[in-house]
């Protein structure tokens, strides 16, 4: 079968723009997410909060679980592969998954190489903390980006930091002349043509979602107002007191992110949010966002 072009894969990712993608660990959770208005679900055995709490090596989910979730919903299904583990990605593609997340939430399989995403028919999403990381992933074939944030914490501070870093660097690029763009591209180890494209268009060449620590409707709206194209919500929904209601509220806040009255209304009576973690109290070797390069 012919491989889809990168442009086609970017177009598929564009279809998710403005939406919410939710982590789910059972077919029932996937149905709740779809009914709440999620544009896609991420099939996982453990949400990031449980991966963080339980430790050990986190790998690709069991294909049986992924297929059960795929059969339960009509919206696209994503699944995670370890950084650099191209065979996990091959397995996910064989299962008929719609998108693959080469994810720092799982334990990296290769500490020197990311997956060559151009070799696959289906789109990849990758995390980034800044513009350089994002453009390096795009050069490898990523069709969609997301902030890394700090998954499983219920603390949005790192996602905000990463989103602000990306968009402030884009604004800075627009003030540079050609010589400065060459130097900048060399310094961030990204292709000059991609850097020039971003400087001219004032935006990333692919959609960029927020992820990591989003727990409330206001969190989702905050990232949307900062300029992201949509949000991933992991532990924040199904680790809360009323997952179905919180899921609907986060979808509404993502859609109406510039309307505080609506965000206020949907935020009422949601029950207890997930218990958060202060980033500064996480041991350095347990931080996930630093995985990848």
UniProtKB/Swiss-Prot annotation:
Native organism is: Roseiflexus castenholzii (strain DSM 13941 / HLO8)
**Protein's GO biological process:** amino acid metabolic process; pyridoxal phosphate biosynthetic process; pyridoxine biosynthetic process
Catalytic activity of the protein: aldehydo-D-ribose 5-phosphate + D-glyceraldehyde 3-phosphate + L-glutamine = pyridoxal 5'-phosphate + L-glutamate + phosphate + 3 H2O + H(+)
Say which enzyme class the record assigns.
lyase
Pathway annotation: Cofactor biosynthesis; pyridoxal 5'-phosphate biosynthesis
User: Where is the organism placed in the taxonomic lineage, from the top?
Assistant: Bacteria, Bacillati, Chloroflexota, Chloroflexia, Chloroflexales
Q: Which residues make up the binding site for D-ribose 5-phosphate?
A: 23, 152, 213, 234-235
Q: Where is the active site?
A: 80
Q: Which gene encodes it?
A: pdxS
Any idea what job this protein has?
Answer: Catalyzes the formation of pyridoxal 5'-phosphate from ribose 5-phosphate (RBP), glyceraldehyde 3-phosphate (G3P) and ammonia. The ammonia is provided by the PdxT subunit. Can also use ribulose 5-phosphate and dihydroxyacetone phosphate as substrates, resulting from enzyme-catalyzed isomerization of RBP and G3P, respectively.
Named from the GO MF annotations, one term is: pyridoxal 5'-phosphate synthase (glutamine hydrolysing) activity
| PROSITE patterns noted in UniProt | PDXS_SNZ_1 (PS01235), PDXS_SNZ_2 (PS51129)
Task: Indicate the family of this protein.
Answer: Belongs to the PdxS/SNZ family.
Q: Write the protein's name.
A: Pyridoxal 5'-phosphate synthase subunit PdxS
Record key words, sorted: Lyase, Pyridoxal phosphate, Schiff base
- Database matches in Gene3D superfamilies: Aldolase class I
InterPro entries recorded: Aldolase_TIM, PdxS/SNZ, PdxS/SNZ_N, RibuloseP-bd_barrel
Which Enzyme Commission numbers does its entry carry? 4.3.3.6
Residues reported in the UniProt entry to bind D-glyceraldehyde 3-phosphate: 164
């Amino acid at each position: 079968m012919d491989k889809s072009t990168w442009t086609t894969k970017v177009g598929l990712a564009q279809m998710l723009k403005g939406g919410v993608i939710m982590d789910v660990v059972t077919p029932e959770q996937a149905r709740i997410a779809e009914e709440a208005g999620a544009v896609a679900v991420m099939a996982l055995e453990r949400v990031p909060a449980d991966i963080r709490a339980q430790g050990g090596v986190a790998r690709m989910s069991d294909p049986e679980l992924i297929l059960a979730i795929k059969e339960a919903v009509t919206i696209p299904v994503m699944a995670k592969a370890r950084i650099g583990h191209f065979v996990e990605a091959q397995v996910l593609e064989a299962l008929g998954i719609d998108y693959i997340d080469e994810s720092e939430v799982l334990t990296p399989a290769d500490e020197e190489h990311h997956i060559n995403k151009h070799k696959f028919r289906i789109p990849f999403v990758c995390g980034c903390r800044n513009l350089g990381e994002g453009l390096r992933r795009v050069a490898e074939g990523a069709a969609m980006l997301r902030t890394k944030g700090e998954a499983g914490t219920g603390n949005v501070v790192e996602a905000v930091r990463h989103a602000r870093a990306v968009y402030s660097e884009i604004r800075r690029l627009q003030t540079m002349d050609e010589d400065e763009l060459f130097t900048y591209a060399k310094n961030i180890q990204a292709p000059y043509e991609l850097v020039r494209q971003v400087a001219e268009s004032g935006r990333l060449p692919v959609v960029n979602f927020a992820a990591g620590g989003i727990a409330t409707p206001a969190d989702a709206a905050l990232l949307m107002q900062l300029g992201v194209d949509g949000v991933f919500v992991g532990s924040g929904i199904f680790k809360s007191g009323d997952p179905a209601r919180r899921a609907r509220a986060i979808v509404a806040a993502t859609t109406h992110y510039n309307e505080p009255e609506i965000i206020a209304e949907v935020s009422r009576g949601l029950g207890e949010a997930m218990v958060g973690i202060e980033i500064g109290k996480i041991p350095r070797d347990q931080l996930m966002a630093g995985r990848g390069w």
